[in-house]
Every structure is written in structure tokens, then in C-alpha cells.
Amino acid sequence: MAKLALIRLRSGIRARGEVRDTLAMLRLHRINHLVIVDDTPSYRGMIQKVKDYITWGEIDKETLAKLLRKRGRLIGNKPITDEYVKEKLGMTIEEFAEKVVNGEMKLRDLPNIKPVFRLHPPRGGLKGSKKRSFKEGGALGYRGEKINELIERML
């Protein structure tokens, strides 16, 4: 089962109530926040509802490992370290990221991990308008594998 990375790009100021509720259920409370979810029909429906406020795509194991290493946080705002992952799970961050992407483990199998990753705005800016879809040359919507390039620029 593939893992999807969802990044919120737009504010919810003028959004309908159900869109704001769905963004809250996805834990995307602020702009430039990222969450990792399973590619299931229920999440697909939620993504479809908020497609005008987020961008998403399939994350690969290298990008997930970098994301965990650089932006992953534990409760108390402590960074995720190799020592912590080794102590709790008996593996490195790269091995954990590979198992998460392959569906063998979930992110929450690592105790005390925060489910949201707070990112910087992308270096070089978003390639296009925040009001148009990625297919039309904008920034929103489905990106596929190109989400990894955007995450790299936001780390």
C-alpha cells in the first residue's frame, strides 16, 4: 500500500465549513504542514474534498528518511535521532522509512512521534499559482512522484 504525502498550501479563511473540518481531520491546521497517510478509499475521499487547498503524491523512502531526520519531532519538540529509533525499534531511520513506505509499519509505531511535519516554504517558490491545479501549471492537486522534489525544497 502506497503512502501519500499531503501538504497544505492555502489558508482556510474563506473555505466552506466541511472543507475546514476535513483539513482538521487530516491534521493540516496550518500552511506548509505535511502529513503521511495510507492510500485508502476513505482518505482519497477526504483528499478529493480538500483538493483546492492541498497538494499530494506518493512519497519515496529516501525522502521520508530525510523528512524524519530533519523535520520529525517527538512529543516535547525533541528531534528524532538514530539513537532513539535504534532504542525503541532496533533499526535505523532509513530502515524504518523503508518499512513505512512498504506498509510493513506505520509512523505511529515509533512511540511519541508527532504526526505532523512543519516545513519551510519551498526554496525557489511554488512553480505556479496557488489557485490552479498542478496539471494546469499551478501548485495544487495531485503531483505523483514530483511531490518528493517539492518536499526536498521545503526541508
Swiss-Prot record:
Organism: Thermococcus kodakarensis (strain ATCC BAA-918 / JCM 12380 / KOD1) (Pyrococcus kodakaraensis (strain KOD1))
Protein name from the UniProt record: Large ribosomal subunit protein uL30
PROSITE patterns in the record: RIBOSOMAL_L30
Quaternary data: Part of the 50S ribosomal subunit.
GO cellular-component term (any): cytosolic large ribosomal subunit
GO molecular function: RNA binding; structural constituent of ribosome
SUPFAM superfamilies: Ribosomal protein L30p/L7e
Family, similarity comment: Belongs to the universal ribosomal protein uL30 family.
Any GO BP: translation
Keywords: Ribonucleoprotein, Ribosomal protein
Name of the encoding gene: rpl30
